[in-house]
């Protein structure tokens, strides 16, 4: 699917990137590394944290691996968006969120050599790993894509 509908998903990705980069800029500009501001005591904090790895700090310092994987994933998402049918809006929204999240963290890796994380939540006494807007968009995007695939996807004609 080219045209107007694809543009909507790219605009969604651009909005995610803008919000992600703006919030990270605020954290870097106005908070000390390790500083934590309670939003809801024992539940939600804004905590200035840096991550040189993948989700939850895995694969620390493997920059070239992240660069390569991100370029491949972004290209795949763009190809998938272009092939969507007009009825596959949920998949398009999921892919737009994933695209924005992937590019948001990629920008950090390229320009900062680390990812700025700042959303720190607790589930009971469990301290969930610190994350950011891009991570959230990626997670929600993957969930939406799975919902689409398992509940709404229909086989293309000729592939049944």
Swiss-Prot record:
Compartments in which it is found: Cell membrane
Record keyword Transmembrane present: yes
Presence of the UniProt keyword Protease in the record: yes
Record-annotated active site: 117, 135
Known EC number: 3.4.23.36
Residue stretches in coiled coil: none
Listed transmembrane segments: 7-27, 61-81, 91-111, 133-153
GO biological process, one term: proteolysis
Gene Ontology CC terms: plasma membrane
Membrane topology: Multi-pass membrane protein
GO molecular function list: aspartic-type endopeptidase activity
Pfam families documented for this protein: Peptidase_A8
Family annotation (PROSITE patterns): SPASE_II (PS00855)
Top-level EC class: hydrolase
Keywords assigned by UniProt, alphabetized: Aspartyl protease, Cell membrane, Hydrolase, Membrane, Protease, Transmembrane, Transmembrane helix
NCBIfam families registered for this protein in UniProt: lspA
Annotated function: This protein specifically catalyzes the removal of signal peptides from prolipoproteins.
Family according to the record: Belongs to the peptidase A8 family.
HAMAP family for this protein: LspA
Name the UniProt record assigns to this protein: Lipoprotein signal peptidase
Organism annotation: Geobacillus thermodenitrificans (strain NG80-2)
